[in-house]
Regions:
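Glycine-rich phosphate/diphosphate-binding loops that line cofactor/substrate pockets in enzymes
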Residues: 4, 25-35, 77-83, 169-174, ...
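Thiamine diphosphate
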Residues: 116, 124-133, 276, 283, ...
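Conformationally flexible catalytic loops at phosphate/diphosphate-handling active centers
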Residues: 17, 165, 169-228, 363
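Active-site nucleophile and cofactor-binding loops and adjacent substrate-binding regions
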Residues: 41-43, 62-73, 88-95, 154-157, ...
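Glycine-rich, acidic loop regions that bind phosphate or pyrophosphate groups
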Residues: 5-7, 11, 117-161, 184, ...
Length: 588
């Protein structure tokens, strides 16, 4: 990169940098790692980087968000869709603390992400300067759940080293977020051109994630455990799955006729239409599938951490050693035996593990074929809805989505009972078909779905559908302005029941008829969407939904469809009143 003015910057009345500065070198390093989009909210602390984005606008796009939490969620979504670390830029102090919700989400969801934080100048550090925060303490490993690594770059010449290490750390082992702190004066410092044997700092080459392979002895032992089994069950999910890995998993399942359940909010890992699909193992699990997990004699956990949500609050598998034989395959050795003691623990990335499994030869006769068929029949039976009150029939709404959305549509959600309708009734075609279709936070983060959907539209250009609730939407609804600014079309269905529904449900379960802190007085969401530049539609009956959806698919701009949902319709299986009555009877 030339240190002199580039033709792109040679505009009348526009000053261009004469020297190559740290902010420009940083952007060059991002480009070298294949970054095409960075998300963030601008700040004075990293003006030199913003100038670098201007200088390299033909190679990388900086997406301006309206709040740093939304920016971090968009970077997270971009990473899940591309398999490469998402990139987010925020300023010091409140910018970084706002972004922390997205960093925690990326950590719990094992999403590779690099957060760049503009910081106070070096000569004012440790004086509690304006907006100063000790980011190593705030994000660091001592927080046990925020970032994999936190580093400050004090020497402009070492920017390439730190950026490359951040990307490697974010991708390898258990993927996750890395934070790089950028002192303002370091970014503005001139990058020396080098003399003699000392070369000028340059971006380091593109890095791929390192593949960890299963050792042959472990794979042979896995086959032995399969041959000893009568009721095996695969639970697949977690981070690091590619199209090729999902295809290899499907071939492995087909060769051995194994039933496959997808881990919590990784429902696109295995094709939901496949005759071996058993359902999703997570919140609101099919009771019959929960019993299948308990009754199985061999669990093959391929990819998931086996956290609280996938294990039904650590009840589906006994702690610390399950009754079932347990094979746990994970990309990070630190996750193996951390919660559950596995009979066989295999440290391998999903690409490598699935390729090792697909070549395992199965015997001609398998004793569990009827078991596998019954697992799938249980799943199909769970698609049949219960009769619930009100003018909106949510299973029919989901069936219409299934009918009209293209197979590669991306579905996003935040946190709330509203998501359970999609989780139970929508059937993903699976990553093996060539595309990722689900963006959902396993950390249960409210406000994720709207910005994630916008990032999906920007990243893929595919149809994007977001389901949200009245409480969830107002956490990050301001990002509709970002969507309109960048022409990102999403279709949003907002279920408005006038309360924080999940909390109210649990409130009635534990403290029946003693509501507090859960009722909401809401704005006119359709009018609010129109104010941002979306089409805004309100419906009150099931019959109104299909024409509203078809019109949304035809529009060039995004659409928000507000649905007034009866507060009684609190879950896919029952009513709020029934939960209250059950709690009162229990207390009597």
């Amino acid at each position: 990169v030339s240190a002199v003015q580039s033709p792109a910057d040679a505009l009348p009345g526009v000053a261009a940098p004469v020297h190559r500065i740290g902010g420009h070198l940083l952007v060059e390093c991002l480009i070298a790692q294949g970054v095409t989009h960075a998300f963030g909210v601008p700040g004075e602390s990293y003006l030199a980087v913003l100038d670098g984005f201007h200088h390299h606008a033909d190679q990388i796009r900086f997406i301006i968000n309206r709040q740093e939490g939304g920016a971090a969620f968009m970077a997270d979504a971009h990473a899940r869709l591309t398999g490469r670390p998402g990139v987010c830029f925020v300023t010091r102090g409140p910018g970084a603390t706002n972004a922390s919700i997205g960093i925690h989400t990326a950590y719990q969801d094992s999403t590779p992400l690099v957060l760049f934080v503009g910081d106070v100048a070096s000569d004012t550090r440790d004086r509690e300067a304006f907006q100063e925060v000790d980011f190593c303490s705030f994000f660091g490993p001592s927080t046990k759940g925020m970032a994999k690594r936190v580093e400050r770059i004090d020497d402009v010449a070492r920017i390439p080293e730190y950026v490359a290490r951040a990307f490697a750390t974010a991708m390898n082992g258990r993927p996750g977020p890395v934070v790089l702190v950028l002192p303002e004066d370091m970014l503005a410092a001139v990058v020396e051109q080098g003399a003699g044997q000392h070369r000028a700092p340059q971006a380091l080459p593109y890095l791929d994630a390192v593949q960890a392979w299963s050792d042959p002895g472990s794979v042979r032992r896995l086959r032995e455990l399969l041959l000893q089994s009568q009721r095996p069950l695969v639970i697949a999910g977690g981070a690091g799955w590619t199209v090729q890995a999902a295809q290899a998993l499907q071939r492995f399942a087909e060769n051995w006729k194994l039933p496959v359940g997808n881990a919590f909010r990784f429902q696109d890992t295995f094709d939901n239409h496949h005759p071996l699909y058993a359902g999703d193992v997570g919140i609101g699990i099919n009771p019959k599938l929960a019993q299948r997990v308990r009754d199985s004699d061999l669990i093959l956990a391929i990819g998931p951490r086996l956290g609280e949500m996938t294990t039904g609050g650590y009840t589906l598998l006994d702690l610390p050693q399950p009754r079932q034989k347990l094979v746990h395959i994970h990309a990070s050795a630190e996750e193996l035996h951390r919660v559950y003691h596995a009979d066989l623990a295999i440290n391998a990335t999903m690409n490598a593990a699935a390729r090792s499994l697909e070549v395992l030869t199965a015997p001609p006769l398998l004793p569990w074929e009827a078991w596998s068929q019954a697992c799938h029949e249980d799943y199909l039976a769970n698609l049949q809805p219960q009769q619930l009150p009100g003018d909106i029939d949510m299973p029919t709404i989901v069936a219409l989505l299934q009918k009209h959305l293209p197979p590669d549509a991306v579905l996003t959600n935040g946190a709330g009972n509203f998501a359970s309708w999609i989780h139970r009734f929508f059937r993903h075609h699976g990553l093996a078909k060539g595309y990722k279709t689900q963006l959902a936070p396993t950390s249960g983060t409210m406000g994720y779905g709207v910005p994630a959907g916008i990032a999906a539209a920007i990243t893929t250009g595919r149809v994007v559908f977001t389901i949200t609730g009245d409480g969830d939407f107002l956490m990050n609804g301001q990002e509709l302005a970002t969507a309109v600014q960048y022409g990102a079309k999403t279709i949003i269905v907002l279920l408005n029941n006038g309360m924080f529904g999940t909390i109210r449900m649990h409130q009635e379960r534990d403290y029946p008829n003693r509501r507090a802190g859960t009722e909401l007085r809401n704005p006119d969401f359709a009018a609010l969407a129109r104010a941002y530049g979306y089409a805004g539609v309100k419906i009150g009956t099931t019959a109104e939904f299909e024409p509203a959806l078809l019109a949304a698919l035809e529009r060039s701009e995004g659409t928000l469809i507000e649905i007034a949902l009866d507060p009684e319709v609190i879950t896919t299986r029952g009513t709020l009143s029934a939960i209250t009555q059950a709690a009162l009877q229990k207390a009597a």
